[in-house]
Structures are given as structure tokens and as C-alpha cells.
């Protein structure tokens, strides 16, 4: 979910982190995934130099650097204003421990660190608003809570939903509807866990929340990504959601699709790649990605 946003005269880097799923089908990451991790990490650090403000929505290692990654900490946070999830409240024990480590490492690098839960900031003519802590998925989730981000300047507005999983928490939906953004980046429900970690009823409730967000906001483009892209069959499982978006003439697509690329399901393909049944060219894919985004970044810098 690492996202670079340029709005007005400022650039924000949201959740500068990357990680792999440790086990899938009883298998660890393939060499292809390890290469993708390496290239993603380098790209995140490369683009982070463009940002004046870094944002951390919660303390999972796919959203901020691992504790031993001093290089990533320095390149992502040095001399920046850091707006982060409060590590002392509305947070589980694991989050408190990770947040304390994050604070100890980033505070000596950052220009300043502000706990951002339920706060508003005016930065260079950009209004930045953070939600109160909402659940990482359904209410009561064992993995804790996150904060969402809304940015607005003039007629432009963007909402980044962090790991809210189809806006499963009703308070997450309420905040999204209140902000009524023109562009949304949302985390989809982890459908790979249906039937064992996640109940079908929870999925159906979350879909109703997502439908309302699509119907009742001005957003004409909604990027739906992250947890849901772990499932190759996510479009079939969310068919009613995609049909609704199409009926409303709204674009609902993954981050890769937003840039005109095919989805690259490396984790879901882990078994096939491990068996030699599927070959992938990770470096070529990342070159294609860079060819898409680098001109946009350079234009923004100009």
C-alpha cells in the first residue's frame, strides 16, 4: 500500500514499507518474490526522497520499515515531518511495542513526529485530516487498529483507507462518507481467509459498506488493492461490487490496473512457481512499472 501523493506544492509518502507473506500453501517465498521485495524496497526508498511529509497509518512491517533496516529508515524519514498512528492509545500490545521501536528509530531522523489520530493539519495550503483509530478489518480484530488519511486542496481530494478491509468497521465507512473524496485508495477484504479465519457473514457485511462508499461518495476512481490482491479470484468473489461500480460508471481497479499493467500475483502463484509450472520475469515487470510511473514523478517534480 506504499503510496506517494503530490497535491498542491507538497508530496506525501504514505506507509513506506514492504513485506512478504511468510507462508502460503505451506511454502515460503519464492526467489521471484524475494527479487520483487528487493526491487520494491529500493523503489520505495528512491521515491521517498521526493516527499516532505511521511505518514505511517499503523505498525505492521508492510507499512513501515523493519527495525533492522537502518537504510530504509534514513531514506524514508530523515528531515521529514512524520505524521503517524499514536503508539500509546487505541492500539494492541504488538502495535505498542512496534510503535515504540518506530519512535525510537525515527525520532532522531525526522524533523518532527506528530501523533495524528483524529487530527487535522494545514500544510502548505493542503488540508490533511486523519480519522480516529478504526479497526484493521472487522470490529474487534486481533490485529488492531489503523488511521485513514484524507487530503484536500481546492477541488482535488484523496482518501487513503489503510488496512480497513472493505471498510468493514462501520466507523470507517462513516468517516469516508463524511469526507466524500473525489479519489479513493482502499484495502479490500482478505478473501483468501474466507471459511477459516474470516466468516462469510463478515465478508457480506463488509461488501455492503464498500457498496455505500462507492455509491455515496463523489469518487469516480477507486483503487481497491492490498489484502484482496492475494486472491486470484477476487473479482469473482466481489462480482456484485464490480458490477455496481460499472453501473455507476466509476472505475474500480487495482493499483497495477490503474497504471495499465496486469496484476502480478506472485504470492498466489507461489505453488506454481515453486513447481516450475509458471515462469515470471520480475525485473521486466518492475521495468514496465518504472516506465509508467517515473515520467509522472518527473512531471510532478517540474
Region spans (language model):
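Core dinuclear metal-dependent hydrolase active-site scaffold
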Residues: 1-49, 100-171, 175, 266, ...
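C-terminal regulatory/interaction regions
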Residues: 221-302
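Acidic/glycine-enriched edge-of-secondary-structure segments
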Residues: 28-29, 57, 156-160, 165-167, ...
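Active-site neighborhood of phospho(di)ester-bond hydrolases with catalytic His/Asp-centered motifs
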Residues: 13-17, 51-62, 83-86, 159-164, ...
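Active-site metal-binding motif and surrounding structural segment of the metallo-beta-lactamase
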Residues: 28-83, 178-185, 192
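A short helix->loop->beta-strand "cap" motif at the edges of active sites that frequently abuts
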Residues: 10-11, 77-82, 216-222, 247-250
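Charged helix-capping and loop-helix junction motifs
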Residues: 144, 199-210
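Active-site environment of divalent metal-dependent phosphoester hydrolases
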Residues: 59-65, 89-92, 165-170, 190-195, ...
